[in-house]
Amino acid sequence: MEQLTPDGGVTKRIIKAGLGQRPEPTNFVSVHYDAYLLDTSEKFDSSRDRNTEFTFQLRDSKVIEAWELAIPTMQVGELAEIICTSDYGYGDQGRQYIVPPRAQLRFEVELIGFWEKPKSASERIRLAEKKKNEGNALFKLDAIESALFAYRKGREYIQDLWDCEPEELEEARQLIVSIQLNIGACHLKLKHYDHAIEVCQKALDRDMTKIKAYYRIGQAYMEKGDYESSLTFIRIGLETAIGLLAQSIDLIENTLTDNEQFIHESKVMPSSTIVTVLNYDKRDRNIPAENDRWAAKERIIKIQKTIEENSKISLDTPLVLSATIDASDSHQYQFQSSFGRELFYCSIHAIHHYASIKAICIELGLSVPSHFGLAPSTLQHIKKQ
């Protein structure tokens, strides 16, 4: 039990801990609550019973003083019991027909989320980015409902943003697409597959090159048992990938003027890792990355052709997989599968390759062991050296 006033007139007890940040004194907040008379435990109000979140601005004289003091101390997702005397509630007069005079009150309040009210276009974009980052942090903590709330608030800042400079409009467009995809990821986690399809489709309406959107729609259809639609979207994603590779070729031909522009030293992953991802089945090690732009162009063309050739294969084509069960066991086992099944698996696997996880950790300044994220076969190879 925490005393929030020197006289003990307001106390707070955490029933369920929250995550992330706390609201600023003038933020808008959204809460769910149940309100009781302390002496009789009689419920006199409830947003949950109405199935409607209660939204208000802190320090705007819309709620009792006990809430003004307690809610800024709460984290998103926190459920707290707030008890107050009448001095911090409805005072000597009470609340007509509902709260008696000089009544002590008890509330169970859950902080759903909070946000600022922007003024300019640039501020709306800044706050949308801020909400996106907040949602990302909550998503990593597996607080999916809270992350979804943050993403939605971020989207609200910019979804109707039109009266601004062209640069701001483009920045807002890219940001809302990113937020839509994150909302789709939340819906997948929550098994709201129809919502995931809808929101990712809206992302594609703004940017049809977002391969991740096709994969997430495909994943949602797969979870719904609609394998035909799932693989259709995976195929569209592959066609989009071919188009993006064509843009890379155009960049090499018309923008880069020497090889030095093409080379970039990465602190995140070795070049051999990138090459291995591009040619995963070959399993050669320590392959040097290409540093000649014309040779790179030829490599990209080969990748395009590989995708195009595979796109022509019937999804029902049977396949026999030869694989080891354990990295230390060289015996090959055979499994029956189909081209469509393996295409879907590879597509989903590609968007969360270990290198991405490792890159995120490093970008966040997290200490990552050298063996973090390495495949079992790679660890076995290192041990043999």
UniProtKB/Swiss-Prot annotation:
It comes from the Eukaryota. Inhibited by both FK506 and rapamycin. TPR repeats lie at residues 128-161, 177-210, 211-244. SUPFAM superfamilies: FKBP-like, TPR-like. Signal peptide: none annotated. PPIases accelerate the folding of proteins. It catalyzes the cis-trans isomerization of proline imidic peptide bonds in oligopeptides. It is an enzyme of class 5 (isomerase). The gene is FKBP5. This is FK506-binding protein 5. InterPro entries: FKBP4/5/8-like, PPIase_dom_sf, PPIase_FKBP_dom, TPR-like_helical_dom_sf, TPR_rpt. Gene3D superfamilies: 3.10.50.40, Tetratricopeptide repeat domain.
